[in-house]
Amino acid sequence: MISKNNIYNICFILIFILLAIINKVSSIPENTEWQANHSSDLRIISATVSEDRLMIGLNIRLHDGSYTYWKNPGDSGVEPSIQILPNPEIIQYNVQWPAPIIIKNQYGTNYAYKDDLVIPIELELTNKGNLLNLDLDVEYGVCREICIPVKDRIEFKIINDIENYISHSNKLLKSVLTDIPKYRLDDEKVIRTTKLLNVNGTNVLSIIFSEQVKGVIIDQSDNFQFFDTGNSLEYYEEYQFTFREIYNGREIKGEKVSALIFLENEYFLEDFIIE
């Protein structure tokens, strides 16, 4: 039989643990302070939970009409890098890039962001309940007439326990998650077929669509780099990319490629096999 004193002691310990957890969470600011850089500012947006995933956000605020680049900058520009320094309580993390805009000018075609940008980062933690002091290294370009590379480090805190964030909701971060390109639920395909061409000695991939599209970006290919050669039009029924091998001796026929497709009021990912 448990004595009253033991019950009081157990209750006291539980209350102490609860207060310690509350104190940990309350000691973490909702967002880090803005850090000033060339024509831009940086901060970390605090954690939120979406579909049982713990998310933070890298917030980049661009000044005076400047822009920065997507994970694939396109024909020119500065390829960004976002890295969380190793920590034994982080199993892995995944940077999730919102859909960019397509910029066509005298320098070619580039994929970029303007104004205020939030890049979600999904964290998988060990859930040990500890307060973590983390460092995020970021490199990106800030561009107008010329591009200036920026390199910075942001220090931030997080509780290593997803349950602490279940009831927490950062509206800005949650709204940005809807901007992450996804595959269509109806599984309808917009890419009808592909053709391989040789135009004046240059290898060209031609993509033919089943309906008019506003734009297309080659999102991922393991063995080839693709370069946009399309003119600036309102709609496209066919689009062409030049390409080159990343590894010598690869055959492009049968290569699986992921594309980001823009329609009038939506965008989505679609995989296809080069025929």
Where are the predicted features?
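Bacterial N-terminal signal peptides that target proteins for export
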Residues: 2-11
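N-terminal signal peptide c-region/cleavage motif recognized by signal peptidases
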Residues: 22-24
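Extracellular/lumen-exposed scaffold segments
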Residues: 26-275
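Bacterial N-terminal signal peptides
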Residues: 11-20
